[in-house]
Design a protein with these regions (language model features):
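Fungal secretory targeting signals
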Residues: 1-26
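Zinc-dependent metalloendopeptidases
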Residues: 23-341
Length: 341
């Protein structure tokens, strides 16, 4: 009897040890610092009502006009091949559908508008309707001087957005702010005064301190958007996001070659010689961030994580969370609840 009791106790202790061992590793480094997972470099949307992802790992796209399809179809396919070449599983599909089928179910398709003109590129993040089309859209305006490789790289960047990837350089953990700019312990140094449109914003604000305030257009993404200021594409991402970094990442934690990063002269004004001024550099030795050359393996890791979290589902956003799409409804229901005393 004593032996059986001893075995029972030992089995209970063993089960408890296994339970606590599994609980200690149950966090996910995408949202919990210190979770025991490998560290990789990427940042993507937090799937939600505002930023839904594509079902069945499939994006169906269509062109706005037959002429656009004839001109740009090969460029789109070449860009998608860069993702496969970097190791993206072929379970991810980016396939063309007919305009008629997509117009019948616009929420299930990505509208591609491509043309030549003043360079401009923007894309829905996941299945996010954007103005002025009220559709999931990829907008591509090429200058006309780009070669085939340059086009493919630009489109591959936009495809990353379409799936839900964010700009690598906009990870909030990479940024540390000083009184008027970025601190020396920030992983990047930002030169707001060199960004196109700064002079107009400075004139409108008319206060240097307010430019760099916590809610100023050189520091706050939402405020920069209000001014139509391109710094919004460079400074930290404000909405919810997921990424794997520890609380204080190092320079080596950043994928400086990511297809989703901006090179150091992006949106820079011209200097007296007609060259673009620096807008964003690495703090380490003030190194210049190069123009992305292709999709990296770590870009692929980020996309795979977005559609296949290592520990199952993403965290649930409860209705009583202020960031929940149902928060307003929740508050209204609470007010109408009958409380018995």
């Amino acid at each position: 009897m004593g032996i059986m009791a001893t075995r029972f106790v030992m089995n209970v202790l063993l089960l408890l040890s296994l339970l606590f061992a599994s609980l200690s590793n149950a966090g996910h480094s995408a949202w919990e610092a210190g979770a025991t997972t490998f560290t990789s470099e990427w940042i993507h949307i937090d799937p939600s009502f505002d930023f839904p992802t594509w079902p069945h790992e499939t994006i169906r796209y269509y062109f706005s006009t037959p002429e656009m399809k004839e001109e740009f179809a090969n460029d789109i396919r070449a860009a998608w091949q860069l993702w496969y070449a970097a190791g993206l599983p072929e379970t991810f599909r980016f396939i063309e559908y007919s305009r008629a089928r997509c117009e019948a179910a616009p929420d299930d398709c990505l509208l591609i508008i491509a043309e030549y003109g003043a360079p401009s590129f923007f894309t829905s993040l996941g299945r996010q309707r954007i103005d002025p089309w009220d559709r999931n859209v990829m907008y591509l305006a090429f200058q006309g001087t780009e070669d085939e490789h340059d086009k493919a790289v630009i489109i591959a960047h936009e495809i990353g957005h379409a799936w839900g990837l964010l700009h690598e350089h906009q990870n909030p953990l990479f940024w540390q702010w000083a009184f008027r700019g970025t601190r020396s312990d920030s992983l990047v140094q930002f030169y707001c005064e060199n960004v196109l449109g700064f002079a107009e914003v400075e004139h409108e604000v008319n206060n240097t301190l307010l430019l760099w305030a916590e809610d100023g257009p050189c520091r706050d993404q939402a405020r920069a958007y209000e001014f139509g200021f391109l710094a919004s594409e460079m400074i930290p991402w404000r909405p919810r996001y997921q990424q794997p970094h520890r609380l204080w990442p190092h320079d080596s934690d950043v994928d400086w070659d990511s297809i989703m990063i901006y090179e150091s002269h992006s949106f820079g004004v011209d200097d007296e010689h007609g060259n673009k001024k620096l807008t964003l550099v690495r703090t380490k030795d003030l190194q210049v961030i190069p123009e992305p050359g292709t999709v990296t393996e770590l870009d692929v890791v980020g996309m795979v994580h977005l559609y296949h979290p290592r520990y199952g589902k993403f965290r649930e956003v409860f209705h009583n969370d202020a960031s929940s799409a149902w928060y307003a409804v929740f508050k209204d229901k609470i007010k109408n609840c009958l409380i018995k005393t």
